[in-house]
Amino acid sequence: NPPETVGNTAGNLNNSGYFCEYDGKVYFANVYDSDTLYSMDPSEQNIKKLGNASVQNILAGGKFLYYYQTGASGDAGIGALRTVRSFNRCKLNGSDVTVLTRDPISTAQLVGSNLYIMTVDDNGPLFYRMKIDKSDKTELANFEINPASAVNGTIYYNGTQDNHYLYAMDTATDGVSTVWNGNLWYPIVQGDYVY
């Protein structure tokens, strides 16, 4: 993917990533079908079911979709306890699903050809980067970093340790800088403004 590729908007991802608009299609978790992955035209025509998994954190870039599978459509009862949760990649038509990780995903974002993943499990939070082919997994932080707001190869996020300042991570170098010493949460950077 080109380095300026971003998988979804911060607004969508900060609201569980149930929608993603990409290349003339809207990909979405259909609430009327157990949050199963669907696509449609922006005019709400040509609706197609793309799989049987319940999904969230939908990302798109290049030839692929990425999503966190939260279960199988219609999971209920004791069977829901065995449901495999995974972060997956598939073609834009929903075919050729590949499991990228079984880590419990809090938020993920696609920047260029890398996935930036925030996971939280019994061992605590972990923020890492891996290539879209599952290679080169690199731990970046052992605290929460929300990668939702990405613009031009930079991830903007709020502090979660000692403050809630606005930070910027350059995805080319993994270098971090402080942008603003204020108090904010779930930043959305658009143009020259931070919301």
Pin down the residues of each PLM region:
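N-terminal "mature head" segments of proteins
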Residues: N1-Y38, S43, I47
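Beta-propeller fold detector
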Residues: P2-N8, K48-N52, T98-R102, T138-F143, ...
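Residue position within the beta-strands of beta-propeller blades
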Residues: Y27-A29, Y66-Y68, Y116-T119, Y156-N158, ...
